Amino acid sequence: MSNTQKQLALAKAAKKSVNTADTEEKNRALFAMADSLEAAAADILAANRQDLEAAAGNIPESMTDRLLLDGKRICAMADGIRAVAALPDPVGEILETSTLPNGLEIVKKRVAMGVIGIIYESRPNVTSDAAALALKSGSAVVLRSGKDAFQSARAIVAALKTGLAQTRIDPDALQLIEDTGRESSYEMMRAKDYLDLLIPRGGAGLIRAVVENAVVPVIETGTGIVHIYIDKDADWDKALRIVYNAKTSRPSVCNSMEVLLVHEDIAADFLPKLERLLVRNRIEAGLPPVRFRLDPQAARHIGGEAAGADDFDTEFLDYILAVKTVASVEEAVGHIEAHGTHHSDGIVTENRHAADYFTTHIDSAAVYVNASTRFTDGGEFGLGCEMGISTQKLHARGPMGLKELTSYKYIVQGTGQVRE
């Protein structure tokens, strides 16, 4: 048995301590985990410095921001755990009841998933978010961090397990796979005897590898090739504010806009205003400017590089924006359906017909009208922190909170009935 299999077995053996814990016990564990995380801040920051030093020069500046921890972010992680404790416990919820003509009483009841595996990349906060959500939803959790964030993840998990040790929940219900080699990921993908669910969080390569190779049930958290379409009937003040926020507030996250579509009737006047906002104003403020990848029509109005063959199919996760002009809302929808990832897409318009057409025909997990796509987030949706953004349709779609991490079973109460 490999070390990874041993850790999977430990999580499976410990799952009953979580599956059977009542709400009070789980919340007590979460508060202890949050307190322990804050108490270990110095150790976590020291570990994070190791990760940052190892990554220096090897990852883009925008990705460094995802990896970076500071005292404020650690406090936010701890507060995120406490916020999960404050959420209603979904386990045990009665979803449906019915009584059959033969007198059988059937109850559909929400139950814990069992053991959840998470494979993720360079975001240390995923470690605490995933642990909190899994444990509150009644499941043990096995985490597999990417190499970039491994030292940070190890220090965070050590702190969380210290908190768990003060409660009735077995600390072995939280595992961080120690082997950061590729084989450990494939072992998790094949671990159907240990894992009830596997969730990948990261770039397109990781997600594709898990979806194509896993024999464990998977929820796909797709990449975010996020579009915003500026209609000819858009309010320009709204449009500029929304585009600025969607692209620059945190470009390294999956709900950040990657592609801007602009109606050709307004492109000549709108795009220069956008260029001023995203490029010149940011340079004057000492901020990184947005770099444009332009189709031929957009290039007539603003400066930037010519869009390459793959630029409208790329999740840049950087201060890069692909820009294309379109002749209609129908063309915008066609482009999004051809190039999007069904994550989050939006329209800016004052035309109700255009908005209705867009929301009806765009088949994404979150579809926006006159708002930034950066709101696709469990916390912003009132779900607490999230396990990821599901872009598939089965079981879960959009931000995955506590309910999306549970299953259900039927409890059938009889008085001696037999089937004829």
Swiss-Prot record:
Its main location: cytoplasm. It catalyses: L-glutamate 5-semialdehyde + phosphate + NADP(+) = L-glutamyl 5-phosphate + NADPH + H(+). One of its GO terms (molecular function) is glutamate-5-semialdehyde dehydrogenase activity. The gene is proA. SUPFAM superfamilies: ALDH-like (SSF53720). Catalyzes the NADPH-dependent reduction of L-glutamate 5-phosphate into L-glutamate 5-semialdehyde and phosphate. The product spontaneously undergoes cyclization to form 1-pyrroline-5-carboxylate. Belongs to the gamma-glutamyl phosphate reductase family. It is found in: Cytoplasm. This is Gamma-glutamyl phosphate reductase. PANTHER family: DELTA-1-PYRROLINE-5-CARBOXYLATE SYNTHASE, GLUTAMATE SEMIALDEHYDE DEHYDROGENASE. One of its GO terms (cellular component) is cytoplasm. Keywords: Amino-acid biosynthesis, Cytoplasm, NADP, Oxidoreductase, Proline biosynthesis. Its EC number is 1.2.1.41. It is an enzyme of class 1 (oxidoreductase).
